[in-house]
A protein has these predicted regions:
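The feature captures the beta-strand-to-loop junction immediately N-terminal to the Walker
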Residues: 38-40
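Helix-to-loop junction immediately C-terminal to a conserved catalytic motif
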Residues: 53
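Conserved ABC ATPase signature
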Residues: 136-140, 144
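Catalytic Walker B motif of ABC-type/P-loop ATPase nucleotide-binding domains
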Residues: 161-164
Length: 226
């Protein structure tokens, strides 16, 4: 894989109703970076994140993930590389049990059934929730759901983790636990958030989005000093 594993050049996206989502976004991320994407509601953060896993394709410009330009033809390869954690865990948890949810991705990627249990339990243990494996997701707390949703992405062994508001709705203890877990991950991390304290703790770099464009890009402590 290329050392510069995420590169956006003049990225634009216009929704079907003509509303611009992002405008002229350019940046380059190198392997192992942790980058916060910050900005007000409606700035374009979520639109940008949805490009990184190929849920949206750019109207104009290019996006490269490792060795793959983001195109319809390369979606499978891009999605093996990038794991997406949505803001609402209920958007990711839909199977009868936690184990089934975390196993869903590896099975779809074609991992041999005999290996699936191992990767599922490793992912659950990484998030500190192996005891939840037989529970139905709808009976979990918000923090437990978030941990399981992240485990469901870790089980697919992505190189890059993309997260939308990972600390949203968590109580202080669950938030602090998640921050410590994120700091321990060696993945490249791209995290959209309004939680600026979390950004300072987890991300050495921050990209500021305003009205769909990049208005600042630099060290988190310099940009978010307050």
């Amino acid at each position: 894989m290329s050392h510069h594993i995420v590169e956006a050049r003049d990225l634009h996206y216009i929704y079907a109703d003509g509303t611009p989502g992002i405008r002229g976004v350019s940046f380059r991320l190198t392997h192992g970076e942790s980058v916060a994407i910050v900005g007000e509601n409606g700035a374009g953060k979520s639109t940008l994140l949805l490009h990184l896993n190929g849920y949206l394709l750019p109207t104009q410009g290019t996006l490269r993930i490792g060795d793959f330009p983001l195109t319809k033809k390369n979606l499978k390869s891009v999605r093996r590389t990038v794991g997406m954690v949505f803001q609402d865990p209920d958007d990711q948890l839909f199977m009868p049990t936690v184990f089934d949810d975390v196993a869903f991705g590896p099975l779809n990627l074609g991992l041999p059934v005999e290996e699936v249990e191992t990767v599922v339990m490793q992912a659950l243990e990484t998030m500190g929730v192996p005891h939840l494996k037989d529970r139905p997701p709808y009976k979990l707390s918000g923090g437990e759901k978030r941990s399981v949703a992240i485990a469901s992405v870790l089980s697919m062994s992505p190189d890059i983790l993309v997260m939308d508001e990972p600390t949203s709705g968590l109580d202080p203890r669950a938030r602090r636990r998640l921050i410590e877990q994120l700091k321990s991950f060696e993945h490249t991390k791209i995290i959209a958030s309004h939680d600026l304290d979390m950004a300072v703790d987890v991300c050495e770099r921050t990209i500021v989005i305003h009205q769909g464009g990049v208005t600042a890009d630099g060290p988190t402590l310099d940009l978010l000093r307050y």
